[in-house]
């Protein structure tokens, strides 16, 4: 039996029928066409499916869609900002590009959203705090030093309002 849910995704309200057994990642990718949320392991092991639910990182591959009712969800698509009718990358997204922290890109949405939640809680993290925050998001291509440096550079830019420091 389906269950009607109302949720807010990237600032847009939606009312949908959640199907039995449907996960949030499936709802986002297949029904709302938000394919930035990746599905890797479907076991909550890799973190590629991470989204923000009410500001906290959650692995969406095991999160029941019906539990998303009444929640505010942010996907990687929701981090980009509209400035004067033009879409711009969030400073975290820009930092990942500038610091070469992207290779295949599969894990990056989950890592960026995890980092975003970290920087909301702690705008000036240490490298160890960044590492700890990323412990549940796996990357097999880019390597963690570039990812950590990108997050620290974005943190500085967000804190100071200055342009992103290039590597």
Question: What positions do the PLM features span?
Answer:
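Signature of N-terminal electron-transfer/Fe-S-associated modules in redox systems
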Residues: 1-167
């Amino acid at each position: 039996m389906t269950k009607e849910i109302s949720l807010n995704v990237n600032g847009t309200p939606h009312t949908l029928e959640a199907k039995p057994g449907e996960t949030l990642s499936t709802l986002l990718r297949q029904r709302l066409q938000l394919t930035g949320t990746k599905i890797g392991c479907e076991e909550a092991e890799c973190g590629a499916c991470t989204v923000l639910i009410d500001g906290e990182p959650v692995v969406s591959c095991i999160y029941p869609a019906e539990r998303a009712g009444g929640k505010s969800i942010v996907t990687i698509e929701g981090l980009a900002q509209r400035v004067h009718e033009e879409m711009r990358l969030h400073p975290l997204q820009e930092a990942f590009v500038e610091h070469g922290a992207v290779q295949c890109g599969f894990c990056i949405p989950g890592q960026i959203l995890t980092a975003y939640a970290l920087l909301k809680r702690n705008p000036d993290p240490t490298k160890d705090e960044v590492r700890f925050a990323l412990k549940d998001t796996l990357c097999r291509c880019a390597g963690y030093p570039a990812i950590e440096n990108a997050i620290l550079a974005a943190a500085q830019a967000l804190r100071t309002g200055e342009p992103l420091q290039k590597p």
